[in-house]
A protein has these predicted regions:
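Surface-exposed cleft-lining segments at the edges of enzyme active sites
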Residues: 90-95, 119-133, 160-166
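Alpha/beta catalytic barrel-like cores
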Residues: 1-116, 124-126, 176, 180, ...
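Conserved, mostly hydrophobic/aromatic
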Residues: 155
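Alpha-helical scaffolding segments of alpha/beta enzyme cores, especially the outer helices
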Residues: 105-108, 134-148, 171-180, 204
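Short glycine/threonine-rich loop-to-helix capping motif typified by GTGT followed
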Residues: 132-133, 164-174, 197-208
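Short, amphipathic alpha-helical segments
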Residues: 97-104, 112, 129-137, 167, ...
């Protein structure tokens, strides 16, 4: 949700650029679009497991009800909050997340608003052991803080589908994730993982006691290819 991406999203929805006078009006239009989606009779927990919210969306109302409460209480859809501030520049074949100086206050607010979990994304571009280790360590380090705040983090170390050594990167990643999961104690996490080259690579993670659920990340594959994988 930014001044750059929102006009494009509104344009695809049918609201022409220039239909608003300032950024506040633009975000009001965006929330009206999101509200219409959430209030649709087709949008229920039968087909939609969870919805990821921006902070601004969490702070607003849908049909007079705070967004997260509306999702869970009216629609049986689990609300998650995007907490990361974007990606740092690529170093050693990977992009860790930028610092999140206001994370603790944000988590406290989210907990008070009925949010179940969080979403934060890093990207792995090549099979660099040290780069992948940094990504996974940061994800779990922040994930533990999120657990301590009473929420369930979605750990998302995306592997770029165009990485030339994708299979090798995924093998390294799988090992690093296992090590972190084994060290978690009594905290539980979710995982969001790029569809892998090796079938059932992440089967042990799906079965792991500390993992609530594993979400498939299509990462740019076509729907047909993603479903095949």
């Amino acid at each position: 949700q930014s001044g750059g991406s929102t006009p494009k999203a509104l344009g695809l929805y049918g609201v022409a650029d220039g239909s608003w006078t300032d950024e506040e009006e633009m975000f009001d239009l965006m929330h009206a679009m999101r509200s219409r989606i959430m209030m649709s009779s087709a949008f229920t927990g039968e087909r939609v497991l969870g919805a990821i919210l921006f902070e601004m969306t969490m702070d607003r109302l849908v049909d007079g009800v705070p967004t997260a409460s509306y999702l869970w209480q009216r629609k049986n859809v689990v609300p998650f909050l995007k907490v990361d501030k974007g990606l740092a520049d690529q170093v050693d074949g990977a992009q860790v997340m930028k610092p999140m100086p206001d994370l603790d206050a944000l988590l406290e607010k989210a907990n008070g608003r009925g949010v179940f979990g969080t979403k934060m994304r890093s990207v792995i571009k090549s099979a660099s052991e040290s780069g992948i280790a940094r990504v996974v360590e940061q994800q779990f380090e922040i994930g533990k803080r999120i657990c301590a705040a009473g929420l369930v983090p979605i750990i998302e170390p995306e592997v770029d589908i165009n990485a030339p050594d994708k299979a090798e990167a995924e093998a390294i990643l799988a090992g690093q994730i296992t090590a972190q999961l084994d060290a978690l104690g009594d905290q539980n996490v979710m995982l969001k993982l790029t569809l892998p080259e090796q079938t059932n690579l992440y089967a042990p993670h799906i079965a792991h006691d500390r993992v609530v659920r594993v979400v498939a990340l299509s990462g740019g594959y076509s729907r047909e290819e993603a479903n095949r994988r």
